Regions:
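Hydrophobic/aromatic beta-strand elements that line small-molecule binding cavities or substrate pockets
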Residues: 35-38, 116-121, 141-148, 158-161
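Active-site/pore-lining binding-face segments in mid-to-C-terminal subdomains
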Residues: 136, 146, 151
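Glycine-rich portal/gate segments that line the openings of hydrophobic small-molecule binding cavities
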Residues: 70-137
């Protein structure tokens, strides 16, 4: 059992706080699933807002918003997260991020460095899903499922490494599992995923509410300025 890390808000979740499974798939490939403890006080609105704004900064210090500026991504996992950014944004008329968008993730866990771009295949009130590829072909996915219940959100993550393309699928699966997504790397990711998701309830609701307050106050200032009569000459 690994030693629990200390994040910005105290002890991070231990590996055994979640239900997890790792499997070698028939015909090649790997799959890992993590069912997290209830994210207490978190809602679907919080999570959707979070993923849309995951590349932003904040001054939240755990108590108020008078701290130094920091990437919100680093609050999620201060030890492992380096940088995240939306490399391509496809939005609807309301500005909501749509499938086809691309997110770039730079992080490290268990001695493994990740600096990759992933295609968003679903982003709605049921899940936030990525597709991973080699040479333009899908070789795996990372799925985030969430469901709101009384008291919080049930959150489950699934990673699968397997290419189902005809003819070269088995070869690409072997290459991916041999060089890019090895068993030790996937197991290290599972620990990382449990730790970062466990931090969500400690700061995402606060950032969400602060954003709503700031936007509301900004809207009131705009409305007031629009109501100021101009003098006529």
């Amino acid at each position: 059992m690994s030693t629990q890390k200390i994040g910005f808000f105290g002890l991070m979740k231990s590996f055994d706080s979640a239900e997890s499974a790792f499997e070698t798939m028939a015909g090649g490939g790997l799959t890992a699933t993590v069912k997290h403890e209830l994210m207490r006080g978190v809602t679907i609105d919080h999570l959707i807002w979070w993923f849309r704004n995951i590349d932003q900064t904040t001054t939240f210090n755990g108590g108020d918003f008078d701290g130094a500026a920091i990437d919100v991504y680093k609050l999620w996992h201060p030890h492992d997260h380096i940088k995240v950014r939306w490399k391509k944004k496809i939005t609807d008329d309301s500005g909501h991020i749509q499938p086809g968008s691309v997110i770039g993730i730079h992080e490290t866990f268990g001695g493994f460095v990740v600096n990759e771009s992933s295609l968003i295949t679903q982003f709605d009130r049921e899940g936030f899903h990525f597709q991973m590829g080699i040479l333009g072909l899908k070789v795996g996915h990372l799925l985030h499922f969430y469901r709101e219940i009384d008291g919080g959100v049930l959150y489950e993550t699934e990673m699968e490494i397997k290419c189902r393309a005809p003819l070269i699928g088995k070869l690409l699966t072997w290459l991916a599992c041999r060089f890019f997504a090895t068993e030790p790397k996937i197991r290290a990711w599972m620990q990382h995923n449990i730790e970062e998701c466990g931090e969500s309830e400690k700061f995402i609701p606060q950032l969400y509410e602060h954003s709503r307050t700031v936007n509301s106050e900004s809207g009131r200032r705009v409305s007031a300025s629009e109501c100021i009569p101009t003098s006529s000459h």
